[in-house]
């Protein structure tokens, strides 16, 4: 168990400028992978008033309409009219994408695909906890669900005055390592100029917060901050610049676990920043699902051009039923953590990445089919081999 009495995590909506950038990068990755599953893609996006700027390195046989994909993605997020300050049909799209360095390619590609080297050096973490049904930390799980609900109400038209940009933050109280109460909720949402703050706060409380958060964790002392600065009409790329990879804690575990520093969006599976982080989640989740530990953090590290991980480490925070040595041996036996092994173990060579770019890459309820790293199909054999 952890020693926190209070722990806070945040999430942001699909209309947050950094998340816009992530979605554009992953939309381009998906479009390329529909034509070329073995493309090398590292696509970065910058969004600011009136412009989308693309940069990075892509080597592919695919022939895609980059500008159209960018515009369609921006429009689908909800920035489709000048009244919102950003219009996918009229914004500038500036393309500065080049090709992957041949020096990197020679370190990754191999005659035998199973010997594929890591696309870069680096360290990645995976994490799981039994404090929620999806084996995620409760603060980030609740924050994501608040943001999903905001999007649902905006897209359905139930709350017509909602706009795409929003943020949520949830502070949980822990007792003996278990969530016992929600201490504070912060929710800020962009809105049309003609909604009063009183009406907005009531609607957010009744239709978002109370709809999402467990009633047994809310109490008389729970503090609510709904649009605490008042008006939030100017948002999205007009209010702030957005860049791919700036919401890596939102994307993962809300700060409850460590992070190796590498972002996910816009990267094909040869980039271990992404694929090994997914594998780390898969390993940790199966360890917890198997009952080997109540909490598990897995670290994996790589050297560029080398297939085998340079290290595999685990931390179970004193909750394990077997030793760390036993768990690591089980990991080595049942999980292929070479880049090629990860790609095929998790079926990562498919165009499904744009859907990961909002509301977290991990712990999405009902996502096990699309997000293969959320499966717990190794739990039974891990439990059997651990003799517990």
Swiss-Prot record:
The keyword ATP-binding applies. Its main location: cytoplasm. One of its GO terms (cellular component) is cytoplasm. One of its GO terms (biological process) is one-carbon metabolic process. ATP binds at residues 16, 165-167, 231-232, 240, 246-247, 263, 267. Residues 100-110 are annotated as: Flexible loop. L-methionine binds at residues 57, 100, 240, 271. Pathway: Amino-acid biosynthesis; S-adenosyl-L-methionine biosynthesis; S-adenosyl-L-methionine from L-methionine: step 1/1. K(+) binds at residue 44. The keyword Calcium does not apply. Coiled coil: none annotated. Binds 2 divalent ions per subunit. Binds 1 potassium ion per subunit. Its EC number is 2.5.1.6. Mg(2+) binds at residue 18. It is an enzyme of class 2 (transferase). Its cofactor is Mg(2+); K(+). It catalyses: L-methionine + ATP + H2O = S-adenosyl-L-methionine + phosphate + diphosphate. Catalyzes the formation of S-adenosylmethionine (AdoMet) from methionine and ATP. The overall synthetic reaction is composed of two sequential steps, AdoMet formation and the subsequent tripolyphosphate hydrolysis which occurs prior to release of AdoMet from the enzyme. Homotetramer; dimer of dimers. Belongs to the AdoMet synthase family. This is S-adenosylmethionine synthase. It comes from Psychrobacter sp. (strain PRwf-1).
